[in-house]
Amino acid sequence: MKHQTHLRWMIPAIMLLAAFAAAAGLFWPGGGEPYALVSDRGEAVLIHARGLYAWDTVSSAAQMQANDLVTLLLALPLLGLATPLAIRGSLRAHLLLAGTLGYVLYTYLSMAMLTAFNQLFVVYVALFSLSLFALVLCLLGIDVAGLPARFSAGLPRRAIAALLGGTGLFLSVAWLGRITAPWLNGTPPALEHTTTMVIQALDLGLV
């Protein structure tokens, strides 16, 4: 695999920081009882008031802690498994590594932009930056010209394309409906405590 020199230190750094960030999100001490407030747009929201995500809403905190759990139980083991195999030349591991880095990039880009400011903000930014450049290096190491010859003729290309297209269509319908509803009904957008739709922007722009 190309760019091994950089990836050999970048990926362990990502794993260490992601393990710390995810564990902190799940086990950070302190907090009180959730409380209600009204946002600047007149929307009633419930603030979590516990742990690392104390300043986020109950709904947002639950979603972020679910991401933390996925990171600890799935993403980090996959990085640990795929990295040495990819370095030894396994194409499957290389593609798995790229996909897992994409997950880390998406997760910590959204955390850096959407999570209420907390003690780990700099960690989120570091993970966003490291995973972005690691993903770029990982993708640059793929022999794109020789890639078709590495796949079986029996690969279900249409099924894969349908799955990807269906996922994109589902997200588009779901998020565009949420975006246009306030225009049509004259109601406040469902932003909770935020000022804009960060996840919707990422999903519609990237996914």
Model-found features: residue ranges?
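Interfacial helix-start motif at the membrane-water boundary
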Residues: A49-L74
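Alpha-helical transmembrane segments of multi-pass integral membrane proteins
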Residues: M10-A21, G102-Y106, A126-D143, G154-A181, ...
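Membrane-interface helix-loop-helix junctions at boundaries between adjacent transmembrane segments
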Residues: T83-L137
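Alpha-helical transmembrane segments of multi-pass membrane proteins
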Residues: L16-E33
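N-terminal membrane topogenic signal
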Residues: M1-I11
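A loop-to-helix transmembrane entry motif
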Residues: Y35, S60-D68, P188-V207
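Membrane-interface helix-boundary motifs at transmembrane edges
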Residues: L85-L91, G146-R157
